[in-house]
Amino acid sequence: MSKQVFEMIFAGKKLVVETGQVAKQANGSVVVRYGDSTVLTAAVMSKKMSTGDFFPLQVNYEEKMYAAGKFPGGFNKREGRPSTDATLTARLIDRPIRPMFAEGFRNEVQVINTVLSFDENASAPMAAMFGSSLALSISDIPFNGPIAGVQVAYVDGNFIINPTAQEQEASALELTVAGTKEAINMVESGAKELSEEIMLEALLKGHEAVCELIAFQEEIVTAIGKEKAEVELLQVDPELQAEIIATHNIALQAAVQVEEKKAREAATEAVKEVVIGEYEARYAEHEEYDRIMRDVAEILEQMEHAEVRRLITEDKIRPDGRRVDEIRPLDAEIDFLPQVHGSGLFTRGQTQALSVLTLAPMGEAQIIDGLTPEYKKRFMHHYNFPQYSVGETGRYGAAGRREIGHGALGERALEQVLPRLEEFPYAIRLVAEVLESNGSSSQASICAGTLALMAGGVPIKAPVAGIAMGLISDGTNYTVLTDIQGLEDHFGDMDFKVAGTREGITALQMDIKIEGITPQILEEALAQAKKARFEILDVLHGAIAEPRPQLAPTAPKIDMIKIDVDKIKVVIGKGGETIDKIIAETGVKIDIDEEGNVSIFSSDQAAIDRTKDIIASLVREAKVGEVYHAKVVRIEKFGAFVNLFDKTDALVHISEIAWTRTANVADVLEIGEEVDVKVIKIDDKGRVDASMKALLPRPPKADNPKKES
């Protein structure tokens, strides 16, 4: 196929799609140019079905540093493991694509997005999401798309689609919404305490824009799309299925209705073991033994899936006996750990998270050096999910995509209420340790994080709580669930996480397993989530009503002063000589940023105060009209030079020493003498003139005698 080009104007920028020129051996490939961002997307599919019990979809988002005209860091000077942002973007693309493959599809699919050029004002992640859907749609891979995604900002009461970097900086909302032509199927958002009404409007505005992109994709697919390949889907033997349902469904139904998680798992496992044992014995010598046993396991999974959903939709019974809008028992505790800077333990049913706060100087802030300009990240929220939290063994090692994603969600939810750097000059790290999990552990980590921040004396604007909402839908009827547990997440259609304060929403995240949900469901889920959020905030308030007025004794003491940017070099000195001398003298640690914010860190408050005085003296400038207690440092015939402070001298001209005539400066002043002077002039070269006589009373003028007539 020769090169073909398609283009449209979207959100004020040219969107260009090129096919048929590069990566032609992939099942489908496109080059997407949006503004000056360029992304190559290639989609490939294995020829055979994989043997696993899940759909092996892999989505990558690769940031090439040359795209921004930068060298990679590190010794090897080449790209290494994906950055956190790249990992989050890969997840962002994976989530709306995954539901668009048929049930039982097991061929391995890889979608590789490579950022070739980067424009911070034209979203490369959204170009990659568009390219991922389009590469799959024009290929022979059986993908039930297209989908598309957009970013939405909210500035001065107006919604902006795919904002520029400057617009996003001014926005009260950072929202990514994706979906099909019919409905939304993925949401990721951080917000500055916005109402449910504004968030819902933003979602709908975003979906309108999504539909524009889908229409463009459909035009391209009509023009160049390949015929879809015939692939084998994982399907069970219907006769075997009917037999197992007839003989074992009643026992499995009873097991599913056991309310306590561990007991329910034991009961369902016991039923499954009986069934599996029965068929293992029956078909041990059968030539299709492996296929039959795979079918048995899949049938049992389908039976459990169907029963959980039937109980909720028909009988309104949840696995643990709760009402559809009922939260599990809650408990909140602070100061769980000694020595640390702050800690909070939050428990919701059988889900429990411990959050631990650490404060440090801004020098410990994380330096982010990606495609965007380098910056310092002040707040970090890390999420750990050990396998013991679900009573299992498993892999231990570096954080995976799920842990990175859950940590980022908590970070977005909590960073909206953090104090400004000027008010609280600390780098802040929260670590959430999931100690038990039966669903919604990411939201428990947000609640525990609020407790740890408040217990540690971080003056947050308001407490934040999070709740996970679920959905069971049969296409006609649906049930929205509050505070979903693991089984409801696993067998349900939606995981919709909502975090916020009493004033509004600070974070949203939605993943679904069906092709989309309606505005009505979104509105109902947001309303139920608000009610639940307020209940949880009441419990957090019971543990700690407001942030402590003081930091923990173990927390570092940090003070901050602001200096003019042109004075930074004065404080640092030649080769760092001045700042090194201050540190050696006071024993503190000093961090200075490019905006002139000076952070002083020490366990000794007196040392901090001494350092502030030294720096204030270094950057101090003489001002006309101010009085200084000065020391004479040099005497000349025309006057005396006096030191006002540090390295700032002034000239007291001979005529400014006294109101009476001074014949000889040396007769009046001597080196080392201390005198009070007033600054009367500073010229354009910074030279200072001072006066002694300006501080002395002016003698009265002598009366001239009248002439006699």
Curated annotation (Swiss-Prot):
Q: What are the EC numbers?
A: 2.7.7.8
Span of domain KH: 556-615
The GO terms describing molecular function are:
3'-5'-RNA exonuclease activity; magnesium ion binding; polyribonucleotide nucleotidyltransferase activity; RNA binding
Task: Specify the enzyme's EC class, one word.
Answer: transferase
Q: Where is Mg(2+) annotated to bind?
A: D489, D495
- Which part of the chain is the S1 motif domain? 625-693
Instruction: Name the cofactor(s) required for activity, per the record.
Output: Mg(2+)
**Functional summary from the UniProt entry:** Involved in mRNA degradation. Catalyzes the phosphorolysis of single-stranded polyribonucleotides processively in the 3'- to 5'-direction.
Which protein are we looking at?
Polyribonucleotide nucleotidyltransferase
What is the organism of origin for this protein? Streptococcus agalactiae serotype V (strain ATCC BAA-611 / 2603 V/R)
Encoding gene (name): pnp
